[in-house]
Amino acid sequence: MPNILPFVSKSLSFDKEAIRENRRNLKDPDYFRPSGIQTFFGEQGDGKTITLIHFYKKIAKRYPKAIVVSNIILKDRTALKFDGSLDKLKSILSREIDTVSSYIYYSSLEEYALVNQCVRNGKYGVIIITDEYQNYFSNQDSRNVPPWVIHQAAQNRKQKRIHLVTSQDYDQLVKAVRRRSDIAFKCKSFALPFGLSAGPIFTIYWAFIAKKLEFDNNGKRVDGSRPLKMGFFFQSQALRDSYDTNQVVFTGSQADGIYLASQPTVTVKKLAVPLKRRKGVFSR
């Protein structure tokens, strides 16, 4: 018989102070309750990133004291950059941070590790945004995933932290992260008919229990096919303008500005004959 079994018992005793603390937390509007890893997946142009931004804004509005940490350039906030320096990051965290109008920006894998290690906000919470998560930790490289990734993923609730990530295919994410994901959102965007829209403007998303999603070798979903819930929204111009929609996610060492798609690296000669629009199509 295992030596631990004699310690198994049935106890109805409870701590009154623990119950009081739980009640205080429930009544505290600043107490950050969202937690875990929430994944948004879909093909290019299906609206996974804008759906993530849609959710992040709702959470940030509800919890204005939460610190936002993002590898997406958020245009409606001031970026606090530390350029891979632990000392700079600690300097940022040592000062008072305006959580409503600023955010901590990271890009490289090293910077991602530092923000996971250092950024804590107590009961007010942390919102971590990671676009194209498979670029950091892919399922193709599962054996080389550092232990801290698993450690941090397993302790999001304790640290009052929610991690919003995107991936083109859910099964591209490293297995250790998929196992600790809570909800996986399948995203799909559509353009309005009759030439009223030049691109996707209406987005639908389906919420699945992430742990139940299974895929075959071709990436086709074979299990977990019944969504818990479905939602949708129209993409507003304000939502699109709140982040850099052309940004390229790069996780390695980078020269200043090279990998920011919003910064042109070429100069295009002006056309002698401007394009004209005929029946919704531009042509010369």
What feature does the model see in each segment?
Residues 1-29:
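N-terminal pre-Walker A segment at the start of P-loop NTPase domains
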Residues 7, 183, 198-284:
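Conserved P-loop NTPase motor module
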Residues 48:
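Conserved lysine of the Walker
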Residues 51, 55:
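Hydrophobic positions on the alpha1 helix immediately C-terminal to the Walker A/P-loop
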Residues 65-66, 123-127, 159-166:
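Loop/turn-to-beta-strand initiation segments
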